A protein has these predicted regions:
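C-terminal structural segment of proteins
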Residues: 1-170
């Protein structure tokens, strides 16, 4: 794995300053399960120079209703969403989706933000050392489109005036 700087942000303000300072050279993590594996296997088209960890920031793990909106903090674990009484009563589809996401271990550790921001699940994308330089990595081709793609997204499988890609919805 290439070297990178790791910042443990103590506050939202500190995280925002680091994001502003490093811009596109940085990635925000709260555990980094997804991105660290990609970095280790040299999968990313551009390797981040900085990882900004927000895991220790207080107050980012909440579920609350405000007016007609449900607000969920970035660090709220999937299991907490699945078990929350308010979510189960007023937003049962969300509770069910959270309860069926991944394995129990991942639900206990994984956050809603990490789940939303996780990278593409396409096995062509995940081949180590960028052996398949696909559209998602800046290439010109989607290998899953004509290859083995039975577990890929049905959304975005064709694009107007562009090469098809089946990776729209990880």
């Amino acid at each position: 794995m290439k070297r990178f700087k790791h910042i443990n942000a103590a506050s939202s303000e500190e995280a925002a300053l680091a994001i502003e300072q490093y811009g596109s050279k940085a990635k925000v993590i709260a555990g980094g399960t997804d991105i660290l594996g990609q970095m280790k296997d040299n999968i990313l088209p551009e390797y981040p120079e900085v990882l900004i960890n927000i895991k220790k920031i207080d107050g980012l793990d909440y579920i609350r209703e405000e007016g007609n909106s449900l607000k969920i903090g970035a660090l709220t674990r999937l299991e907490d969403i699945a078990r929350n009484k308010l979510v189960k009563k007023r937003y049962p589809a969300l509770a069910e989706a959270a309860a069926k996401t991944a394995s129990p271990h991942i639900r206990e550790q994984g956050t809603i933000a990490g789940n939303i921001c996780q990278s593409n699940r396409c096995w062509y994308y995940w081949v180590p050392d960028n052996r398949f330089y696909c559209i998602r990595k800046g290439g010109k081709r989607c290998y899953a489109y004509a290859g083995e793609g039975r577990y890929h997204s049905i959304f975005g499988s064709t694009r107007v005036n562009d090469t098809p890609c089946v990776s729209e919805c990880p």
